[in-house]
């Protein structure tokens, strides 16, 4: 018994239809009335047994000659049997699929060709134009405040020069060079040095950049921030800001005003040589300009009160030989003429002692006024003398210079002692003269 499944039977029926000459076309009933005898049905030829080679040989024997051509021409069979076996491989006979493959291959070749040309164009552009080098500011040294000050300077330079090109004063040879700000900043040691910008006088010119100390750059930056903040507060109407501005203006006026050092005619010589001498030396060491004002208590009070107007006092008191009407009240007013002579001599001794102190301090001074009323001495620090040449330094050794200084000091001390003895003798003679009277 041979068992035939449903699928196998359907395949057999299709093959039977294709093998019959009467059924060249499906559902074609024109040839049914023909009297041609049908060929005997051979079931064994349709069965596939054994190996694949035997099956294929039987298939080829079953469908040979004109019957094979009939299978290919039957469009109903071709709908279900799209492949024919050639060995162990399946070959598609669909012409549409082959055309689609050819179209895809042409499209891919065109796309690849376009990509290649675009890449060649990019390579050509790269070789034609070299890429621009990105310039960046590298600020790694220094404190945060110093870095902020430097960033503020960079922004100021950018406002004037968009390309960051500046005129730079080279600190090594003090020559003016045109340089890029990035090179200057990247070579700068912000822990020690800073930068300072001078705005150009004309619009087209480049800004001038110099090196300075870091603390100077930070100070300039902080003052700018403070002034900017003050303006903002004043615009808002802050009372505290207005008060701070007034106090600052007063302090600036006091600094700009020349200092006045007051002396009374009744000062003793010991106080003059100790207290006042130390104060004069301290002011000279600071390099301050000041005025020595000698007079009575009334005039001293008016001098202290008019500190801001000492310029007018200087002009009024310079080159005054006669006593004014206002100064007549300050003249020595005593009944005994001998007391007047004694007071005048005492005042002369105070002025001589003061001159010796100023000469010892090596300061420049100018005396004006009248001894009967008041005297003003304008003092200024000594002018810096030029350093001696190297040849003179070699000739005068350090030991010889020290000896010379010591001798000069001794001479000055001896002169002072002699003056003091003379002053004391004069005072003693005056006092003895009074006692005898």
Swiss-Prot record:
Residues 117-129 have a biased composition (Basic and acidic residues). Residues 1-24 form a transit peptide. Residues 104-132 are annotated as: Disordered. GO terms for cellular component: mitochondrion. Residues 107-116 have a biased composition (Basic residues). It is found in: Mitochondrion. Its main location: mitochondrion. Transmembrane segments: none annotated. InterPro entries: AIM23. It comes from the Eukaryota. Keywords: Mitochondrion, Transit peptide. Belongs to the AIM23 family. This is Altered inheritance of mitochondria protein 23, mitochondrial.
